[in-house]
Design a protein with these regions (language model features):
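Conserved donor-nucleotide/metal-binding helix-loop-beta segment in metal-dependent transferases, i.e.
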Residues: 47-88
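Conserved beta-strand elements of beta-rich interaction domains across eukaryotes
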Residues: 14, 46-47, 54, 74-75, ...
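Catalytic core and acceptor-binding pocket of nucleotide-sugar-dependent glycosyltransferases
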Residues: 92-186
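A generic structural motif
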Residues: 7-16, 69-73, 120-122, 137-144
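A general structural motif
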Residues: 35-37, 64-66, 156-158
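Structural alpha-beta junctions
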Residues: 2-9, 62-66, 130-137
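A conserved donor-nucleotide-binding helix/loop in the catalytic core
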Residues: 15-42, 48-52, 94, 118-129
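N-terminal anchoring/stem segment of glycosyltransferases
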Residues: 1-38, 190-225
Length: 225
């Protein structure tokens, strides 16, 4: 990076098992750290150190919190995002890709996220977030900012900035597998409404619903329901 910041890469040359691997990697890393050490976690492939972090600690301490999470930009709409991930503090949705905090509280929080059988780290982050008063969301985006596709060209004043990954076939398939468990009921209800409102299309809509339900049963992740 252009600022010469020392970075510890976690999970390199390890087999990817799922999103919770990131949490496990952080917990392993901080196991040897002191409780009062402050750790910053950044997703490796889509995050930029946008500004010199020389004043990072002083900015963090002004938030008067032990753990600071980044805010989800909700590019797919607030309702859908909350349906998938839940919410954290002040009606904001936490993003699991950027966060920082003291080792002591991070251990408590991150270990709590691993208690869930759900394989989606971001949903677990939001569920566990509600349990602890020592967590805040970076609503002002002074330290962390997650850029959504519709604000991709926006200049950011945050120290760390995460950009959306490019859309690909593999990403689309992965999204279906992981997130259809939260949305399939809504989709089937919409198809049912469509059949009622447009009876002439009853047959094709029925087969679309049957196809989607079959794909869901066979392939979708169901760990969070």
């Amino acid at each position: 990076n252009e600022f010469g910041v020392s970075i510890k890469v976690l999970g390199w040359n390890k087999k990817w098992e799922g999103y919770t691997d990131k949490v496990v990697g952080v917990l392993e890393f901080i196991e040897t750290k002191n409780d009062e050490d402050i750790i910053v976690f950044l997703d490796g492939f889509d995050t930029k150190i946008n500004k010199n972090p020389e004043h990072l600690i002083s900015v963090f301490k002004k938030y008067d919190t032990k753990v600071l999470l980044s805010k989800e930009p909700n590019p797919m709409g607030k309702y859908i995002a909350k349906t998938v991930f839940g919410d954290c503090k002040g009606n904001n949705i936490a993003n699991a890709g950027l966060y920082m905090g003291y080792v002591k509280e991070l251990k408590i929080y991150l270990n709590d996220t691993l208690k869930s059988k759900c394989k989606d780290d971001q949903r677990n982050f939001n569920i566990s977030c509600k349990k602890y008063d020592f967590i805040k969301i970076d609503e002002e985006e002074k330290i962390f900012q997650n850029i959504s596709p519709n604000t991709f060209n926006k200049n950011s004043d945050a120290i760390f900035v995460s950009y959306p990954g490019s859309l690909s076939f593999n990403r689309t398939i992965r999204a279906f597998i992981e997130y259809s468990q939260f949305l399939y009921i809504h989709v089937l209800c919409l198809l049912l409404i469509g059949i009622i409102l447009f009876p002439h299309y009853k047959k094709p809509l029925f087969y679309v619903g049957l196809c989607l339900l079959t794909l869901y049963i066979l392939f979708a992740d169901k760990s969070c329901i």
